[in-house]
Curated annotation (Swiss-Prot):
Subunit (UniProt): Homodimer.
UniProt-annotated catalytic positions: D68 (proton acceptor)
Protein name per Swiss-Prot or TrEMBL: Ribonuclease Z
UniProt source species: Pyrobaculum arsenaticum (strain DSM 13514 / JCM 11321 / PZ6)
GO molecular function terms attached to this record: 3'-tRNA processing endoribonuclease activity; zinc ion binding
Keyword Isomerase: no
Taxonomic path: Archaea, Thermoproteota, Thermoprotei, Thermoproteales, Thermoproteaceae
Pfam families attached to this UniProt entry: Lactamase_B_2
Amino acid sequence: MPLLKLVFLGTGGAVPRADRMLPAIYLEDWLGHRILLDAGEGVQYRLFQIGVAPSSLTLVAVTHMHEDHVLGLPGLVITAKFLGGKVKLLGPRSAHGILSRLGVDVADGYDGGRLRVRCVEVCHTVDACGWLLEWDVGYKLDLKKVEGLPKWALTKLIRGEEVEVGGRVIRPEEVADPAHKRYRRLLYTGDTGPCPRMLKTVGEVDVLIHEATFADDVDPNKAHEEGHSTVADAVEAAKALRAGVLVLTHISARYTDKARHRQLAGRVPPPPHVYVPDDFDTLLVQL
C-alpha cells in the first residue's frame, strides 16, 4: 500500500521559538526511502529524537540558501560521515558550488527507479527550488481484460512492463483500469509567494506542503514582496493543483501559537484536507 510518513521536525520560519524550530521535514515512503526536506539548525538532534540516524538518509533536499533552511547541514553531514554514511544532497544549481564544499555529492534531481525527485522553480527572493516527488505505484489492472493470463504476466504488467503471452504482445496501458492513477505526487514548496509558473509546471499533486508564513493579519502584498505566502495563498495553490492534502508550515515567529492558522484552515471545505502541524507531529498519508 502506498503510504507516506511525514514527521515535522521544524515548522517555523526565519526565527525559532522555544516550541517551534526552523524548517525540516522527515519523509519516509513505503519503499524505504528516507528523505529530509530542508535542514534547519539542529536538525540532526531532532532526527535522533525520532530514532533516525543521519547516515540512513537517502537524500537531503534543501530549497534555498537562506540560513534558516541550511544551518543544520554541516553538523548533519559530519555526523553522517562519522557513522559511516554519506549524504546525497539536492539543491538549486546556483548553490551547488557552496554546498559541494561540505564534501558531499550535490545534484538538482534524483531518479531512484520508482521515485523521482526534481526541482520546480518557485517565487522567492533568491534562487529556490520547490521539490516535486513522484512515485510510480504501477498499474491497476482491469480484471476482465487480464482474465486467463498467468501470474508472472500480471506481475510484469502491474510494474509497467509489456509481456508476450501465446504470441500476443500485451502492453500495460491496454489492460489497465483507466480510473487508476499510476503516479502519486507530493510538492514541498519551501519559501514562496503565489507562483503561477510553479502551478503551471506541476499540474496536479496528491499532497502539497506549502509555506504559510502569515495568517490573515498581514497585507498580502507585503507578504508577497518578501517572497512569502498567507494561508489563503496556500489554499488557493492547493485548489489549483487539485491536492487532496494540504500541509501548512513555515509559520512566522510573530505568532505565539497557530490558533489563527488553524481557524482559517478549518474553514476550508475539503478537498483539500488542511493540516497545521506542530513540531514532532507525524502525518500518515495513503496515496
